[in-house]
Curated annotation (Swiss-Prot):
The reaction(s) this protein catalyses: Hydrolyzes the link between N-acetylmuramoyl residues and L-amino acid residues in certain cell-wall glycopeptides
Gene Ontology cellular component list: extracellular region; outer membrane
Principal location class: secreted
Enzyme Commission no: 3.5.1.28
Organism: Rickettsia conorii (strain ATCC VR-613 / Malish 7)
Localization: Secreted
CDD domains with a match to the protein in the record: PGRP (cd06583)
Annotated Polar residues bias: 10-19
Protein name: Putative N-acetylmuramoyl-L-alanine amidase RC0497
One Gene Ontology MF term: N-acetylmuramoyl-L-alanine amidase activity
PANTHER family linked: N-ACETYLMURAMOYL-L-ALANINE AMIDASE AMID
Region feature Disordered, mapped onto this chain: 1-25
Length: 267
């Protein structure tokens, strides 16, 4: 089985990489509109390349723990195969319009400063090459675009990923919440009715692929989990963090430009 050959480009992306086996052209007229972050689970680039090839999967870029960046596909013309069944902001099939970036990480450890520093450089480069790509609003985790997937859902890039640090650098958004807010439970697995329906509508408005069912179903749980991981809004000591708290509601309200707690209080 042939392997994709990477270009080592000193950590800054370009659009001259050779096409590997596991890719397809982007649809005509489609340009990247989001960047999707995932992690490898595998310990190094060699191991992750073997896993990707076995699965017929691919990403545009891989960033190693020491900050080394390798490019595998042209992010302007090629769709890599990393998202599968996915959606973002109502658009189905994220591979068609996303740029996939994988960080070497075992899903349990902190991300090294060198790696995150290189990611920031990469994201800055992307914004310069694609001025219409809004990475304050359209930088997402793989888990966020695959919440509507059956079975074992993705949670990448996980709770260790430093979303706050990236937001401080201008990539993504982050809002501080208090321990008191995190400890106040609003909705949980056995919740039903209008409050759940309103939460589902708001998560969908934010961009997640959930539907309004008025029950705290599997896809709502997955959406709440990755939201809590990203914004640090989960119920203290709950693992996985699938309950909805006042902290989560506060952040979601700010993300949507709404009054804090307006939805659940009026439901």
């Amino acid at each position: 089985m042939s392997k994709s050959k990477a270009i080592e480009n000193n950590g800054i992306s370009n659009t001259n990489s050779p096409n590997g086996k596991y890719m397809a052209p982007r649809p005509e007229g489609v340009k990247p509109t989001c960047v999707v972050i995932t992690y490898s689970v595998s310990k190094d680039i060699k191991a992750v390349r073997e896993v990707l090839d076995e699965r017929g999967a691919s990403v545009h870029y891989i960033i190693d723990k020491d900050g080394t960046q390798k490019e595998y596909h042209n992010d302007l013309t090629d769709q890599a195969f990393y998202a599968g069944k996915s959606s973002w902001k109502g658009e189905v099939g994220v591979n068609k319009f996303g740029i996939g970036v994988m960080l070497i990480n075992d899903a349990k450890s902190d991300f090294p400063a060198e790696q995150i520093g290189k990611l920031k450089e990469f994201l800055k480069d992307v914004t310069e090459r694609y001025p219409n790509l809004d990475l304050k609003h359209d930088l997402v985790g793989l888990g966020e675009v695959t919440v509507n997937r059956e079975g074992n859902a993705h949670i990448a890039p996980g709770s260790k990923f430093p979303w706050k640090e990236l937001a401080e650098a201008g990539f993504g958004r982050y809002f501080e919440t208090t321990q008191e807010q995190k400890s106040k439970l609003l909705l949980s697995l056995d919740s039903t009715g209008e409050k759940v329906n309103t939460l589902q509508e708001n998560l969908k408005e934010y961009g997640y692929g959930v539907e309004s069912t008025s029950t705290f179903d599997q896809f709502t749980q997955q959406a709440v989990r990755v939201f809590n991981d990203r914004y640090g809004t989960g119920l203290p000591n709950e693992e996985p963090p699938v309950s909805w708290t006042e902290a989560g509601q506060d952040v979601l309200s700010q993300l949507l430009g709404q009054t804090v707690l307006e939805q659940t209080e009026n439901a």
